[in-house]
């Protein structure tokens, strides 16, 4: 029988309290509320101390090290311990805002069986999600969205029964077929990660210990698969029925051996039942949210000369500020001495010392810089049909005009063309005008319109550019009449559906875009595509290179 919403909460917390290090933790998707407090209040049942952390926590707090301010004040080395030095339950607030660096550090800490992470995901939007590296490592997931308060109750975990379960956990026997069954079920559910069946096996052992079983049973496996696989499973796809096996001739005796004894009876772990049970518990829309990711906040508002961010390593200097010395921070020595100088006579009298310099933590000044990333404008040009050469000429001219100002605006440009049955990267991101003219010379055109292929390649180029620290923008130039689907077929309806799906992926990735309709009359299909991209739509028939360059400059905020 499937678990109810609150029964699922209690079951997850019970297993986590038995083996927190083996299950790694819990992804709790819920806004701050009394309901969430009811769940976090039950974390006291876990056999580890609770430590609260936040997305901006520094390496000094996580790993410890030399406390420079205290060392300067005391005159002797002062070492502070880090949160990760001792096993703990790490409660991460606002987990959806976790940056990749912190996610990597927490993931490394979870790989050692010492800590347990409770990720409090407060994301209000579909694209605000926990980093996938942490999603993969945490065994359990709970979503409290839409759960009424009246259907909940106080969580009372029996401490004596939990202690007994922990004591017998190591002695629980695991049948060899249990791990194989979980691995096959994960594969049938479309789960690629190898961590998932390992975590499910740990959950099954914890469930067996809770129930007092000497070995893992099929019911333990079913409960573990429900709790660990449901939010990871891919939707069921329609598969073609298998071809019937040829029947042997009637006059030929059947010499095949009888099936093994285990197959003649009932399977110990019925895989089909496990798969159906997991699919029944599949959270609604979670897979689409995971596909969209949490990157839409990153590049949505990039304008001007690229994304600007405050840093402490390089860029245009900003006034220093008070702060603590942590990993990556650079002390402003002059600013620190200037802040400490007026207090020296008073400090010498208070400490009755003739030391030359007495520095307090409040004197520390940290250098700040404003870093500006380079922009890259990715032209995705429709090079198909009779008007291909005109569009390519416009794009070539616009690229050369933009490159002429690239050094002043820190711009790069890239050009890809889609025609025939595929898309091709003509020009990787560059600022070289000579290289650009050489690559653009003699670019062919004509054929079908694989619009979805162009969007897919633009997405790949944009993500690669962003990984290199650049701020990409996609400029799509087309007349909107896509007629080649992703599978290569000349199916206009499927091609339009594929293009809209790729547009949603591009929007979810956070890459800003602009759609330029080069048809003689505005195309409603392109306006719909622009809405799917959340991008400006500009109808620009008979555009020349100067007009196109001006439009793109305005769209990018110049």
UniProtKB/Swiss-Prot annotation:
Residues 234-268, 298-325 are annotated as: Disordered. It catalyses: protoporphyrin IX + Mg(2+) + ATP + H2O = Mg-protoporphyrin IX + ADP + phosphate + 3 H(+). Residues 298-308 have a biased composition (Low complexity). Its EC number is 6.6.1.1. Pathway: Porphyrin-containing compound metabolism; bacteriochlorophyll biosynthesis. It comes from the Bacteria. Residues 376-555 form the VWFA domain. Keywords: ATP-binding, Bacteriochlorophyll biosynthesis, Chlorophyll biosynthesis, Ligase, Nucleotide-binding, Photosynthesis. SMART domains: VWA (SM00327). InterPro entries: ChlI/MoxR_AAA_lid, Mg_chelatase_ATPase-dsu, P-loop_NTPase, VWF_A, vWFA_dom_sf. One of its GO terms (molecular function) is magnesium chelatase activity. It is an enzyme of class 6 (ligase). Pfam families: AAA_lid_2, VWA_2. GO terms for biological process: bacteriochlorophyll biosynthetic process; photosynthesis. The keyword Protease does not apply. Residues 240-254 have a biased composition (Acidic residues). Involved in bacteriochlorophyll biosynthesis; introduces a magnesium ion into protoporphyrin IX to yield Mg-protoporphyrin IX. Belongs to the Mg-chelatase subunits D/I family. This is Magnesium-chelatase 60 kDa subunit. The lineage of its organism: Bacteria, Pseudomonadati, Pseudomonadota, Alphaproteobacteria, Rhodobacterales.
């Amino acid at each position: 029988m499937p678990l109810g919403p609150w029964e699922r909460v209690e079951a997850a917390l019970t297993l986590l309290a038995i083996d927190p290090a083996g299950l790694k933790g819990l992804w709790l998707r819920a806004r701050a509320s009394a309901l969430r407090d009811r769940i976090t209040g039950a974390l006291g049942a876990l056999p580890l101390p609770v430590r609260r952390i936040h997305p901006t926590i520094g390496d000094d707090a996580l790993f410890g090290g030399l406390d420079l301010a205290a060392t300067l004040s005391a005159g002797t080395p002062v070492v502070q311990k880090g949160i990760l030095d001792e096993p703990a339950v790490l409660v991460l607030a606002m987990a959806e805002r976790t940056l990749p660096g912190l996610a990597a550090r927490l993931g490394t800490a979870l790989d050692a069986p010492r800590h347990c992470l409770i990720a409090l995901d407060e994301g209000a939007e579909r694209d605000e999600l926990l980093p996938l590296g942490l999603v993969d490592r945490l065994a359990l997931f709970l979503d409290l969205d839409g759960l009424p308060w009246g259907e909940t109750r106080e969580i009372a975990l029996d401490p004596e029964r939990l202690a007994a379960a922990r004591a017998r956990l190591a002695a629980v026997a695991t049948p060899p077929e249990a791990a194989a069954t979980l691995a096959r079920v994960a594969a049938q559910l479309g789960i690629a990660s190898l961590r998932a069946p390992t975590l499910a096996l740990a959950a099954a052992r914890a469930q067996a210990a809770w129930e007092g079983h000497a070995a893992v049973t099929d019911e333990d496996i079913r409960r573990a698969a429900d709790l660990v696989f449901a939010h990871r499973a891919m939707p069921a796809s329609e598969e073609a029925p298998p071809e019937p096996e040829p029947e042997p001739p009637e006059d030929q005796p059947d010499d095949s051996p009888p099936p093994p004894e285990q197959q003649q009876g009932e399977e110990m772990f019925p895989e089909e039942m496990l798969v159906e049970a997991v699919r029944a518990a599949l959270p609604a829309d979670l897979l689409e949210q995971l596909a969209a990711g949490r990157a839409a906040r990153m590049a949505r508002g990039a304008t001007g000369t690229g994304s600007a961010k405050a840093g402490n390593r390089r860029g245009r200097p900003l006034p220093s500020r008070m702060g603590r010395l942590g990993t990556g921070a650079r002390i402003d020595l002059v600013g620190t001495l200037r802040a400490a100088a007026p207090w020296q006579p008073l400090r010498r009298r208070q400490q009755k010392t003739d030391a030359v310099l007495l520095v307090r933590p409040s004197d520390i000044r940290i250098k700040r810089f404003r870093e500006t990333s380079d922009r890259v404008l990715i032209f995705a040009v429709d090079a198909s049909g009779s008007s291909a050469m005109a569009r390519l000429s416009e794009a070539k001219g616009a690229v050369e005009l933009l490159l002429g100002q690239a050094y002043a605006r820190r711009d790069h440009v890239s050009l890809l063309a889609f025609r025939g049955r595929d898309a091709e990267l003509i020009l990787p991101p560059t600022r070289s005008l000579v290289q650009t003219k050489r690559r653009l010379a003699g670019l062919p055109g004509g054929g079908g319109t694989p619009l979805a292929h162009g969007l897919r390649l633009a997405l790949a180029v944009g993500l690669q550019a962003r990984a290199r620290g650049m701020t990409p923008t996609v400029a799509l130039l087309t007349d909107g009449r896509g007629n080649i689907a992703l599978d290569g077929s000349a199916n206009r309806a499927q091609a339009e559906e594929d293009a809209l799906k790729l547009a949603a992926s591009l929007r979810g990735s956070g890459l800003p875009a602009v759609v330029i309709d080069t048809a003689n009359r505005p195309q409603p299909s392109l306006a719909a595509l622009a809405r799917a991209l959340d991008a400006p739509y500009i109808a620009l028939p008979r555009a020349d290179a100067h007009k196109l360059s001006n439009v793109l400059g305005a769209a990018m905020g110049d």
